[in-house]
Amino acid sequence: MADDLGDEWWENQPAAASSPEQSGGEEGGDTEMTQQDTAPVPEKTQQPTECFLTQTKEPKAEDSRKTRKWKKKKISDILAKSEPKPGTPEDLQKLIRDHYSSSRSVIELEELHLPDSCFLKANDLTHSLSSYLKEICPKWVKLRKTHNEKKSVLMLILCSSAVRALELIRSLTAFKGDAKVMKLFAKHIKVQEQVKLLEKRVIHLGVGTPGRIKELVKQDGLHLNPLKFLVFDWNWRDQKLRRMMDIPEIRKEVFELLDMGVFSLCKSDSLKLGLF
């Protein structure tokens, strides 16, 4: 008993078996560590890349205007699909109604309606200028000989530009005979020079633009009462395929000229209108 008590009792005592709970816990911990060490590291799953739709820039106001302008029908495209039609008196009547509809009453519009008797036969696109004038004015030689009034002409031909006026004057050779022809446009010619020329000479035929003719009438350099024929260069088209009445500036000046006494002369049957 004494010997047993003398020994270091804690040294001789066998190591106590670990409790199942402790051993189990430690083994489980080792297993977990082993699994964590040996298990392959899962590859990082690629996050789905966000897909950004590229937004088309909204067209600016200028771009939209250009697009609309580009889509607008051109006169050349319209003419390519249809044959050109010669101008008629009704075309002029319609332009008169459209021009004055916003500024005149219904009664005033009726007064502006031109009688059919004031219209000469329109060009059917088969005539030259000389042949057309011979047809509508067969007594030109007689009229020319009896005309002796200054500051006036027997016939006016309205066109859209000075270049076109020169072309028409060159094509008058077969018709005019000994008649005196005057250029009535603004290019390189001052109004006062034309006024002085009309005061000095007897002119039978004038070819020019409505703007300059209107200015001569306004300055009392040209009287319209002796006028017998007013011919519109109606069917000719410029490089942009525009007729003279398709050009807003020219159309405006034509109506301003008509307001200077042409309507009343047509109704009195002393003035005839022709569409060449």
Swiss-Prot record:
Domain of life: Eukaryota
Residues bearing the modification Omega-N-methylarginine: 164
Location of Phosphoserine modifications: 19, 23
Residue list for modification Phosphothreonine: 209
Name of encoding gene: Cmss1
Polar residues bias: start-end ranges: 32-56
Family that this chain belongs to: Belongs to the CMS1 family.
The keyword Repeat belongs to this UniProt entry's keyword annotation: no
Biased composition (Low complexity): 13-23
Name used for this protein in its record: Protein CMSS1
Name of one Pfam family that matches: CMS1
Chain residue ranges for the region called Disordered: 1-91
Ranges annotated as biased composition (Acidic residues): 1-10
InterPro entries: Cms1 (IPR032704), P-loop_NTPase (IPR027417)
Keywords (A to Z) from UniProt: Methylation, Phosphoprotein
UniProt cross-references to SUPFAM superfamilies, sorted A to Z: P-loop containing nucleoside triphosphate hydrolases
